[in-house]
């Protein structure tokens, strides 16, 4: 279950970033996180990584979204 939540959040970050028209590098610059860190969070292997609520808050703020959007269930379709 714990691994699933990291995957869910990572995919929702990717979805919201794309909806905002941002690249991973642009999001990294807005959050002051590294591009590699953003890439890992969004990757399918993100379930191996952990990140804090403070990190999610910073990302949600950079995306100008409510942090709760990062915990929404994924659509049946891929979140390309």
At which residue positions do the language-model features occur?
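The alpha-helix within a helix-turn-helix
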Residues: 17, 28, 60
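A short, Lys/Arg-rich alpha-helix, primarily the initiator
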Residues: 1-19
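Residue-level signal for the short linker/turn that defines the boundary of a DNA-recognition helix
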Residues: 11, 21-22, 51-54
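Short alpha-helical DNA-recognition segment
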Residues: 22-41
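Short, charged recognition helix plus adjacent turn
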Residues: 69-80
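Residues within the helices of the helix-turn-helix
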Residues: 14, 25, 57
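Short, basic-rich loop-to-helix N-cap that marks the start of a DNA-contacting helix
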Residues: 45-61
